[in-house]
Amino acid sequence: MSESAFSNRIVQSLLDTDFYKLTMMQAVLHNYPNVDVEWEFRCRNGEDLRPYLDEIKHQIELLCELSLSPEHLAFLERITFIKPDFLRFLGLFRFNTRYVKTTIENDELCIRLHGPWLHVILFEVPLLAIVSEVRNRHRYPDTLLSQARDRLYDKFEWLTTHATTDELAELKVADFGTRRRFSYRVQEEMLGVLKNDFPGQFVGTSNVHLARQLDLKPLGTMAHEWIMAHQQLGPRLIDSQIAALDCWVREYRGLLGIALTDCITTDAFLNDFDLYFAKLFDGLRHDSGDPVKWAEKCISHYQKLGIDPMSKTLVFSDGLNLPKALDIFRALRGRINVSFGIGTNLTADIPGIAPMNMVLKMTACAGQAVAKISDEPGKTQCKDPNFVAYLRHVFKVPDLPSPEKPA
């Protein structure tokens, strides 16, 4: 088989996405089937993606050819919390380009989604994977799988040199790298290596297609969009996080119990994360801000509620690599269970190659603005500054200045 990092088709199937898109999609089907949403793509570092417009459009059109095979549906059917009516819906589901607008605006690539949440929700991950791989095909056409493979083995060597055997036995790592992967073939290759040779515990992948293909566990619960949408779906803004968690609990009855804390801020989240939720959810996910300070805050919260932190799990997923994961693991070992979801550093780390820095985020729900503030100054995402100000006011979040970038 060719050692080229690229294949003809970028997105392999409807399952070539993050698992949490499917878990949220089922909850949307059952609770909000007619809600409209809007999303916008943003390249964070100003890279010129205009030359790739036509090819990106072509790849988006190819998405419409995808449907779930009986084998795909049989795989999902084995997951206990995937309901029969959702499986029937997925069997009929097709991507529809009427909900996608891809243009050049102000000399930048612009991708906007607008349509029913139920029909738009699956676009995010494949669209980002398409932009990344199209760009990489043009910029780095001669890249070989061996370059990515050798880089990963170098990381394994570093880990076995710096971690003890006991530490490695407890270090749990998962792949969260679909959306910014260098290419599909690189992610597939990396997962095979991780499954067979990772010196710690490799616990699975967020990619459902590759989980099925490589007999791995598909991982994921909810994303920021779930909590953001409830800013316009709940009865009052102040109750939006509670509404999001309540709806999740009704849908999954204690399963899929890792909650994301930083949609507004972790402090604002923990104010709503009372004894009921703290007992019911298995743990929390970190996605911005200082990871150890965040963990200390979570441990303290559990202790105040009379819950043993060792009965809970913290999942870390913010720009991780193996050295960072090992540092966090050591800081928290024996105090609370930890697991690490590593993305770009596994699926797009090739010597001499700069990975994409991009996002595709929900900007409106039910015709009104939604926002993510996060625990990191400068990571706020919203088109409407007035709504952000209102959100900060309601949740008593101070407006911190963004850190200045060096000249």
From Swiss-Prot:
Any single GO CC term annotated in Swiss-Prot or TrEMBL for this entry: cytosol
Protein modification: Transiently phosphorylated on a His residue during the reaction cycle. Phosphorylation strongly increases the affinity for substrates and increases the rate of nicotinate D-ribonucleotide production. Dephosphorylation regenerates the low-affinity form of the enzyme, leading to product release.
EC number assigned by the record: 6.3.4.21
Source organism, top-level taxon: Bacteria
InterPro entries the UniProt entry points to: N/Namide_PRibTrfase, NAPRTase_N, Nic_PRibTrfase, Nic_PRibTrfase-Fam, Nicotinate_pribotase-like_C
GO BP annotations, alphabetical order: NAD biosynthetic process via the salvage pathway
Keyword Phosphoprotein attached: yes
Single GO MF annotation: nicotinate phosphoribosyltransferase activity
Keywords: Ligase, Phosphoprotein, Pyridine nucleotide biosynthesis
Annotated metabolic or biological route of this protein: Cofactor biosynthesis; NAD(+) biosynthesis; nicotinate D-ribonucleotide from nicotinate: step 1/1
Modification sites for Phosphohistidine: 224
Pfam families: NAPRTase, NAPRTase_N
Class of the enzyme per the UniProt entry, highest EC level: ligase
Enzymatic reactions: nicotinate + 5-phospho-alpha-D-ribose 1-diphosphate + ATP + H2O = nicotinate beta-D-ribonucleotide + ADP + phosphate + diphosphate
Matching PANTHER family: NICOTINATE PHOSPHORIBOSYLTRANSFERASE (PTHR11098:SF1)
Function: Catalyzes the synthesis of beta-nicotinate D-ribonucleotide from nicotinate and 5-phospho-D-ribose 1-phosphate at the expense of ATP.
Family stated for the protein in its record: Belongs to the NAPRTase family.
HAMAP family on file: NAPRTase
Protein name listed in UniProt: Nicotinate phosphoribosyltransferase
